[in-house]
Structure formats: C-alpha cells, structure tokens
Amino acid sequence: MTFPEADILLKSGECAGQTMLDTMEAPGHSRQLLLQLNNQRTKGFLCDVIIVVQNALFRAHKNVLAASSAYLKSLVVHDNLLNLDHDMVSPAVFRLVLDFIYTGRLTDSVEAAAAAAVAPGAEPSLGAVLAAASYLQIPDLVALCKKRLKRHGKYCHLRGGGSGGGGYAPYGRPGRGLRAATPVIQACYSSPAGPPPPPAAEPPSGPDAAVNTHCAELYASGPGPAASLCAPERRCSPLCGLDLSKKSPPGSSVPERPLSERELPPRPDSPPGAGPAVYKEPSLALPPLPPLPFQKLEEAVPTPDPFRGSGGSPGPEPPGRPDGSSLLYRWMKHEPGLGSYGDELVRDRGSPGERLEERGGDPAASPGGPPLGLVPPPRYPGSLDGPGTGADGDDYKSSSEETGSSEDPSPPGGHLEGYPCPHLAYGEPESFGDNLYVCIPCGKGFPSSEQLNAHVEAHVEEEEALYGRAEAAEVAAGAAGLGPPFGGGGDKVTGAPGGLGELLRPYRCASCDKSYKDPATLRQHEKTHWLTRPYPCTICGKKFTQRGTMTRHMRSHLGLKPFACDACGMRFTRQYRLTEHMRIHSGEKPYECQVCGGKFAQQRNLISHMKMHAVGGAAGAAGALAGLGGLPGVPGPDGKGKLDFPEGVFAVARLTAEQLSLKQQDKAAAAELLAQTTHFLHDPKVALESLYPLAKFTAELGLSPDKAAEVLSQGAHLAAGPDSRTIDRFSPT
C-alpha cells in the first residue's frame, strides 16, 4: 500500500537536498586552493621537498608535484632532496614549469619570446619548456606548448633541427655561432600583441644586442646584432629559486633606468634616488621599446661599462643614486654558462675583494663602496680596481670557456651576468640578517661566506708571519742534525707534550701534520686536501668522495630530516639516529653493564653509566666496555685506543687462563671479568661489590666458587700495587 503524500514529500526532499548541494558548491575553489599553495611555496611555508637544478634551489610541496608530474612522483616518494639533470632542464626553464604546475598557465614573457622572431641558431624559450615538460612527464604542459608552437608554425622547425635557415637547434646543443659555454642562452623579445613576424635568416638590424631581466635570470641574444627588450616577468620571487652558489656574481653593470610598461611610486624603504618598481599588466599591448646598448658576448677585451656613465653610456647616472652593484649583487642568479661562479668552491687568494679584507679593511668603511649588508667585496675586474686587472695585476680569464665548466670567473666582456627583477633591489624578499658568518677565533661577523673565508685567510697569513721564522729555524736545525728548537720537537706530534709549539698550535691537520692555533684556520687549511674529492657541497664548499655522502651533508644545511618515526612522528637526519630512537618504543636495551647488570638502549648511556663506576676504580669501567670498543683512551702511534689497567689485572688474567686451560673465547671473557674484580681484592671495604661479576664469571665458565677463589688468591697480591701501565687490549695469546 502506497501513500501518495509520502512520495510527494520524499521527492520534494530530494529536490531540496539537490538544491542545497548546488548552493554549497564553490566554483573557484580549486583555483583559490592552487593560489594559496603557490603563495605558501613562494614563502617556503610547509614545503617538504627541495629540487636542485644546476646551482638553483626550488622549494615545493610533494603532493602538488606528484599530482602534476609522473616523473617527479616517482622521485618524491624516496627522497626530500631531488637533483634534476641540468642537461634536460635549466633553472630558468624549471622556474616556468613550476609556475605552471601551481598556476596552470605560462607567463606572458615566454609566450612573447616564442612568438617573436629569433636570431638564427638561438633556441626558442617555448621549445625549451616543451623539452623540459616532456622530460618531467607533464602532459598538460606538453600539450599546451605543442599547441602554441603549431599556432606559430614553429613545431616542425623544432623537429627538423637547426640545419635549415630559420630552423632552431635542438635543446642542449648549441647552434651555429654560439659557444659551448652558453648552452641556455635564449632570446627574449617584447611583442605581446599583434601577429608575429615571419622568421628570417637575417637577424634584426641594430647597433647592439638586448638583455632581458627575467626574475634574476639572464637571457641574452646571440652574437649577432640586436633585438628588442622584453619586460620583466610579473610574478618574480627569489624564494622560488634560491642561489646555492658559493661565490657571488659581480654587480658591475646595471641599467640606467628599468624599462617598464607601468610605473609605481617608490617603496618607503627604497634607497634615495632609486628607480620605481615595475610590473607588467596583462592587458597592456605596447610597441617594442628601444634597446639598451651593452657589451657584445663575443668581445673578450674588457671595456668600461656603458651602464655606469662611461664609454658609450647614453648619459650620466642621476646624482645620489646608489651604485648598481650594491642594489643588484645579492639577487643575481647563476645561469649555466653565463659566468659559472657557482662551480668554484675553493678560490686562490689574489682577488681585489679578498685582498681588501685581508689588509684589515672593511668594505663598508671604504668611501663610495657598497654597504656591508648588501654586497660582498667585488671579485671581478672592472668594478673597483679598474678594468681587466685585479689587485695584484693578474688578468682574470675563464679557464674552460669552451666546455661550460669554468673554474674562474669570466671577464665582463666575455659573459654578461643577469639582472634581477627591479623590486628585488629594494629588499622585498625575506631578510636573512646581517653578519651570520662568524669567525670563531676573533668573533667578528660577516654577511657572506666568501668574506668570512677571506678573513680566515688573513688569520693564516698573520700566523705565518708570526711563526714563519720559528719554522724556518726548526727546519734548518733538523737539517743540521741539531734537533728541533726549544728542545720540545717544535709543533710536531712527536714532540714533548709541554713543548712551546704544542701550546701555540694545538690543532693539527690529519693529512700533513701541520698545526694551527684555532679550529677555523685548521678547517680552512684542510680544504686544500680536498682536490681529489669530486662532489662538492654548493653551500659551504666542502668536498666529498661520494655523491651520497654529499647529499647527506647537505641535509644539515637545508634542515631536511627524511627519516621519520612511525610511532611518534619524530624526524631525524640519519638512519642510525632513527634506529636508536625506535628502541625507546620497543623497549630494547642491548647494552648491558658488566659491573652491576644494568641495561641501556644506547651505547652513550652505558658509557655515562660506567663513568659512575669509574669513581671507585677506572679499571672496572674500562674492562666492562672491552667488548664494546672501550672508552676513548690515550691514542698510541698506531692510532688505536689504549686502556689503563692496574698491573695485577693482567697477571691474574694470564694465570687464570693457564691454570684453567680456557679456550680462546673463554680467555677473553676471563680477562674482562677479572679486570672488573681484582681491583677490589686489596680493599676489604668494597669486597662485596665484586660478588656480582665474580658470580657471573664462575657461571659463564662453569667453575665452582672454590676453584675461582683459589685462582684469584694466587694473583690477588699483584693487584694491590698502585702502579698502572698503558698497553693494548689484552690478548691471552
């Protein structure tokens, strides 16, 4: 039996429920969610993965990368630090790919560069993005790039290679007329609106070439004449890609005034006389702006910088404007092949900035110099000491210009360094603070690691000046057969412990036995022995023999803790730390005290516990840890640790082994247990403390108490002697 009224109410309820669900839907929820995630990425908030491309570092979220790229999904499962092949994707291209993942669109500057005519031999930006998207397996980006390239009729040219006139060289191979040291140089033009001109074999005419400021990345045209300039990218943030290079690039050239489609009033914290911040409006369609003159890429002779009002400058700089290097130095990015300052890790002394610091001068104190908090001392010629020559008169040249892995900085005429987005000069990114790098011996702080290294080298020179004559006298005396001066062996390890050299230089190098008076100077010296280690840390410069060791070392800099406890969520940087922590949850205590029977989860806790027993006798503590490697004792000539035992312990142990005819493994057990008991035999007040190890000794060896007492009584008188000796671990054989 049915009730029509009930059916009507049920249907009306379903309709009302459907209407309620429709009203709860937020059409722009997914877009807002991506926008919030992108904001968190730019601020480094809750980022759980770091992608390293060349010398640039990018923070991101694992879930977002795994949902967008099948290739990245397979990587983020296993590690929190990813290294991408820089032959397949460059830092500038990966920045665009990461922006697409978080926003769903490519920037206008890339589309304009792909739509504009490019010089023969140069590769289009959109083609590089397509190659990177294919490598990272991002199908949406691949489809978008192919669609845009087909629209402009350039997809077939990419397939055909660079053999034809107007075609483009494949990604990763330099075109004709380009040097191999600049594999990622791209052309960028400003024609956001209007039909693109057809590609021609002849490059655009003009007296100069063009430089584009693309979020602290450099995009320079080929060696041909000029093109026009592309506006900076809108969403520029240095947090998207942080530079891990040890050395900073030069800030010797800066445009007279940033080109912009729309100007904003200067920021309140802007330096006096600085230009306004700029950004690009999406709806604007302006004609191409006139190019700026600059040094040609192929010109190897350094000349005065045209951007600083000298040589061919369009005009002098406005008075009161700060030096361009002081504004742009910190935020210049390293593009592969454009001044590979990131590849150098241990710099020989001799650059102008280092010599200035070694002489005791402060860069902030020099008149007309950049402020200390913003710019380190310039390391390139042509910035302070004149064009092309350092402080000691040596010319700076690129050591491997044609291979792309230069060890030394290139001259200003050889490579052009990048310019950041204009608002980066006003200090908008997060503040890292001043003087974070502190010299341990003197406590002086510096804003950059290269200034600290130069300062430490000044300590080395000062030390050599103070003790150079003493070392020379020692060498001369040793050659004459008179022995080292001061009668104490100088500062060698074999000298007397109380020698003058031992007191003045207590820190020694394990490789060459050189000694220094502070650990910071010793670490600086140890870097000279790292030449055979091919894997350097791009943050501190330390080198390693294996890539895995370098990756684990970088976790300490980046704050990565990939090993997490499943029980409590606590994270660790090393696997063995997690193993020790898991014993807290499992209750496992593998380390046992052989004196009192106490058990511990970690070996360091047992060592601390044995120090308590060492108050009554140091021999008992050392013997209890004989099976665990022993306490750290006095190292001998072979580098092995020694243990201090009373003289009678070895006599009793050897006597016990001979009379009981023990096996090899039983002899070691007898030596350990006797070392724990015999030092108590001469003191009747503490005789009860020996009951536990003695009972354990008899139980393990299967001896009766009478037999054990008889053996111990024969050697007990030897244990009463106060003398002790330091020998190797006891071996009954």
Swiss-Prot record:
In-chain residues carrying the UniProt-annotated modification Omega-N-methylarginine: 159
Domain BTB: 47-110
Compartmental location: Nucleus
Effect of gene knockout: Impaired development resulting in embryonic and perinatal lethality. Serious developmental anomalies including acrania, exencephaly, cleft palate, omphalocele and limb abnormalities. Mice disrupted in the germ line for only one allele of Hic1 develop many different spontaneous malignant tumors, including a predominance of epithelial cancers in males and lymphomas and sarcomas in females. The complete loss of Hic1 function in the heterozygous mice seems to involve dense methylation of the promoter of the remaining wild-type allele.
Major location category of this protein: nucleus
Gene Ontology biological-process annotations: intrinsic apoptotic signaling pathway in response to DNA damage; negative regulation of transcription by RNA polymerase II; negative regulation of Wnt signaling pathway; positive regulation of DNA damage response, signal transduction by p53 class mediator; Wnt signaling pathway
PTM field: Acetylated on several residues, including Lys-333. Lys-333 is deacetylated by SIRT1.
Region (Mediates HDAC-dependent transcriptional repression): 154-315
Pfam families: BTB, zf-C2H2
N6-acetyllysine: residues bearing it: 333
Cross-link Glycyl lysine isopeptide (Lys-Gly) (interchain with G-Cter in SUMO) placement: 333
Region span, Disordered: 189-209, 241-421
Basic and acidic residues composition-biased segments: 344-361
InterPro entries, sorted: BTB/POZ_dom, SKP1/BTB/POZ_sf, Znf_C2H2_sf, Znf_C2H2_type
Tissue specificity note: Ubiquitously expressed with highest levels in heart and lung.
SMART domains xref list: BTB, ZnF_C2H2
Compositional bias annotation for Pro residues: 193-206, 368-380
GO molecular function: DNA-binding transcription factor activity; DNA-binding transcription repressor activity, RNA polymerase II-specific; histone deacetylase binding; sequence-specific DNA binding; sequence-specific double-stranded DNA binding; zinc ion binding
ZnF (C2H2-type) intervals: 437-464, 507-534, 535-562, 563-590, 591-618
Chain segments carrying region Interaction with CTBP1: 241-247
Gene3D superfamilies registered for this protein in UniProt: Classic Zinc Finger, Potassium Channel Kv1.1, Chain A
Entry note about domains: The BTB domain inhibits the binding to a single consensus binding site, but mediates cooperative binding to multiple binding sites.
Subunit structure: Self-associates. Interacts with HIC2. Interacts with CTBP1 and CTBP2. Interacts with TCF7L2 and ARID1A. Interacts with MTA1 and MBD3; indicative for an association with the NuRD complex. Interacts with SIRT1.
Family affiliation: Belongs to the krueppel C2H2-type zinc-finger protein family. Hic subfamily.
Biological role: Transcriptional repressor. Recognizes and binds to the consensus sequence '5-[CG]NG[CG]GGGCA[CA]CC-3'. May act as a tumor suppressor. Involved in development of head, face, limbs and ventral body wall. Involved in down-regulation of SIRT1 and thereby is involved in regulation of p53/TP53-dependent apoptotic DNA-damage responses. The specific target gene promoter association seems to be depend on corepressors, such as CTBP1 or CTBP2 and MTA1.
Protein name: Hypermethylated in cancer 1 protein
Native species: Mus musculus
